[in-house]
Amino acid sequence: KEKIFVHHENRILIRYTLVDAHSATTLRFRPFLAFRSVREYTHENPQANRDYQLVENGVKTCMYPGYPELFMQLNKKNEFHFDPNWYRGIEYPKEQERGYDFNEDLYVPGYFEVDIKKGESIVFSAGISEISPRRLKQVFETEAEDRTPRDSFYHCLKNSAHQFHNKQE
């Protein structure tokens, strides 16, 4: 499992690679959603919108008014199983150590199922705009190549400095 944020875009990519398998394998991916500010935890509530729409190789949803739609897509055809549930009591020990609230409930709209073969990679995307699933592997590779390695103090400083770059439009 490898995670990477796309530069200058509100999108995370997660790549799963099946290193070894001795039989047919199905990847089941269950996204946990919050739709909240960074310091405001959420708890199970009836205001959460459970609606979703199908998009190419995925779904889009928006839990609350005023938030952007969230597009969740995979680079490969898959099946989305609508199975809405709240996962209660998720805890964040680091936040507890810092003296902050540390407990919340997260909404899971359902799960994606996709067959995966030995040596194959599946890329999952979550972002506020739709993306062509055919581009996901290439975008992941490009972002990974542009990433500063964290193999020395200098590179760690360089990486930290790059986190403050703003894209001017």
Model-derived regions, located:
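Acidic, mature catalytic/reactive cores of soluble proteins
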Residues: 1-169
